[in-house]
């Protein structure tokens, strides 16, 4: 039940999208005009619980922002064991790396609840970044924060005993 609007937004819809964007760290400090330019490239997508958004190895065509619901990012081992890498909730972007790297999605993304997502196509978003250095700086800060979280998680999982690792990992997933 994927329902993209492909960037054709009426004025009221653009205002609603702008309102959501203005509350996200990634877009903080941008002008109304910049937010409207971003809103014009956004596609709104709705997914049911348990629906796959993309698979490990799919072409990285853009990134997403969670508006409602939760999305898990995970890898599957050859024997089918699932390793959750991250859980994203409202206001959190995900799958940004392929936009800049020109690569494929490095993991699977699946909805944990009914979800509303905004999709930012790679080509349109890269053009906006080239025109708006402040957007590029916000994106860099967002990716740096995520790198810091993963670094902390690796430290926790590799340096603690099993009960401590489990407790720390459960706390990490609850954030």
What are the functions of these language-model segments?
Residues 2-49, 93, 98-99:
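Cyclic nucleotide-binding regulatory module and flanking cytosolic helices
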Residues 11, 29-32, 36, 64, ...:
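Alpha-helix N-cap/helix-start motif at coil-to-helix transitions, marked by capping-box chemistry
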Residues 26, 51-114:
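Cyclic nucleotide-binding regulatory domains
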Residues 27, 45, 76, 97, ...:
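Histidine kinase transmitter module recognition
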Residues 112, 130-175:
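Polybasic "coupling" helices that flank or enter modular domains
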């Amino acid at each position: 039940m994927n329902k993209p609007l492909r960037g054709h937004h009426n004025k009221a819809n653009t205002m609603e999208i702008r309102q959501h964007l203005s509350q996200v760290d990634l877009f903080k400090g941008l002008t109304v005009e910049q937010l409207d330019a971003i809103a014009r490239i956004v596609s709104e997508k709705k997914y049911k619980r348990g629906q796959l958004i993309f698979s490990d190895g799919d072409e990285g065509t853009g990134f997403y922002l969670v508006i409602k619901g939760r999305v898990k990012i995970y890898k599957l081992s050859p024997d089918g064991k699932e390793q959750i890498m991250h859980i994203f909730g409202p206001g959190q972007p995900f799958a940004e790396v392929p936009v800049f790297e020109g690569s494929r999605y490095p993991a699977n993304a699946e909805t944990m609840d009914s979800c509303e997502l905004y999709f930012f196509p790679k080509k349109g978003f890269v053009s906006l970044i080239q025109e708006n250095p402040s957007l590029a700086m916000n994106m860099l800060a967002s990716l740096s924060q995520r790198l810091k979280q993963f670094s902390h998680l690796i430290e926790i999982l590799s340096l603690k005993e099993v009960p401590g690792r489990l407790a720390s990992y459960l706390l990490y997933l609850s954030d």
